[in-house]
Amino acid sequence: MSRSLRKGPFVDHHLLKKVRAMNIEEKKTPIKTWSRRSMITPEMIGHTFEVHNGKKFLTVFVSETMVGHKLGEFSPTRIFKSHPVKKG
């Protein structure tokens, strides 16, 4: 079930506050966050986020095509190790 349109997209307040402050100052330093659940909004375009994947922070540069997705979608938590190929 999707989120109600009445509520709007979820973005952590501390994250939105940092983005707005950086837009006013016109800074582009990376923003470190654990908030994988936050939705990417149009005002985040052009910013770099360091999103935690459970072990380390992965750098995510936000572009126009990412709007509407969540930050966690661009920071994978699992690494697939391929199965060995049988020779012979």
Swiss-Prot record:
<dbReference type="InterPro" id="IPR020934">
    <property type="entry name" value="Ribosomal_uS19_CS"/>
</dbReference>
<dbReference type="Pfam" id="PF00203">
    <property type="entry name" value="Ribosomal_S19"/>
</dbReference>
<dbReference type="GO" id="GO:0005737">
    <property type="term" value="C:cytoplasm"/>
</dbReference>
<keyword id="KW-0699">rRNA-binding</keyword>
<comment type="function">
    <text>Protein S19 forms a complex with S13 that binds strongly to the 16S ribosomal RNA.</text>
</comment>
<dbReference type="GO" id="GO:0015935">
    <property type="term" value="C:small ribosomal subunit"/>
</dbReference>
<dbReference type="InterPro" id="IPR002222">
    <property type="entry name" value="Ribosomal_uS19"/>
</dbReference>
<comment type="similarity">
    <text>Belongs to the universal ribosomal protein uS19 family.</text>
</comment>
<dbReference type="GO" id="GO:0003735">
    <property type="term" value="F:structural constituent of ribosome"/>
</dbReference>
<keyword id="KW-0689">Ribosomal protein</keyword>
<keyword id="KW-0687">Ribonucleoprotein</keyword>
<dbReference type="GO" id="GO:0000028">
    <property type="term" value="P:ribosomal small subunit assembly"/>
</dbReference>
<protein>
    <recommendedName>
        <fullName>Small ribosomal subunit protein uS19</fullName>
    </recommendedName>
</protein>
<dbReference type="InterPro" id="IPR023575">
    <property type="entry name" value="Ribosomal_uS19_SF"/>
</dbReference>
<dbReference type="GO" id="GO:0019843">
    <property type="term" value="F:rRNA binding"/>
</dbReference>
<keyword id="KW-0694">RNA-binding</keyword>
<dbReference type="GO" id="GO:0006412">
    <property type="term" value="P:translation"/>
</dbReference>
<dbReference type="InterPro" id="IPR005732">
    <property type="entry name" value="Ribosomal_uS19_bac-type"/>
</dbReference>
